[in-house]
């Protein structure tokens, strides 16, 4: 994943604190042992997970770069939802610097327009693109704000995506 050793260690500590049964020691390494019901594990751990989005830029132009879809746009690519009029992209902090989003957007007044051309979510970690050039489904779900997740249509499609990715309650581990 390209995460620092300390970050990975901290993540394992937090997972072990939430549910000690899913983290096992193999010598000096710690590994995940999710068990048969991945959906149950997700439901147990998801409230403790934070959004992967560090910051968000609402831009008046679409960046000229290859960055994966993120947030609602990524979820729409995996489901029957219709996307917002503007796409949402997921970028790394390095891409944010390369695209000069942090400084240029504020200085030029390009950030935060009422009707943006796109939204760029800067993620706390390197996004792993899923097929179709979108972030992975679980990151897409976690990056949605609470008001979008509470929408009944979005909540229903989140359930459908989770069932496909993690398997239904009755299907166990895939």
What positions do the PLM features span?
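Minor-groove-contacting beta-hairpin "wing" of winged helix-turn-helix DNA-binding domains
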Residues: 28-35
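Short gly/ser-rich loop at a beta-strand->alpha-helix junction or flexible surface loop bordering the NTP-binding
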Residues: 47-125
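Alpha-helix boundary/capping detector
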Residues: 41-42, 57, 167-168
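Hydrophobic alpha-helical interaction segments
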Residues: 95-174
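Short, charged/polar, Gly/Pro-enriched secondary-structure boundary elements
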Residues: 38-44, 76
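A short, conserved structural fragment
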Residues: 16-27
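Short amphipathic alpha-helical interaction segments
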Residues: 3-17
């Amino acid at each position: 994943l390209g995460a620092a050793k300390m970050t990975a260690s901290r993540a394992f500590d937090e997972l072990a604190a939430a549910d000690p049964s899913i983290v096992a020691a193999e010598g000096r390494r710690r590994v995940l042992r999710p068990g048969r019901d991945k959906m149950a594990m997700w439901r147990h751990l998801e409230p403790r997970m934070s959004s992967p989005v560090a910051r968000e830029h609402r831009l008046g132009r679409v960046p000229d770069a290859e960055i994966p879809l993120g947030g609602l746009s990524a979820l729409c690519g995996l489901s029957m939802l219709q996307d917002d009029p503007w796409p949402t992209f997921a970028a790394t902090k390095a891409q944010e610097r390369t695209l000069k989003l942090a400084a240029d957007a504020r200085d030029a007044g390009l950030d935060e327009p009422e009707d943006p051309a796109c939204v760029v979510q800067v993620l706390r970690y390197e996004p792993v693109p899923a097929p179709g050039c979108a972030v992975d489904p679980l990151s897409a779900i976690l990056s949605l704000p609470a008001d979008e997740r509470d929408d009944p249509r979005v909540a229903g499609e989140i359930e459908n995506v989770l069932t496909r990715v993690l398997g239904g309650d009755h299907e166990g581990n895939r």
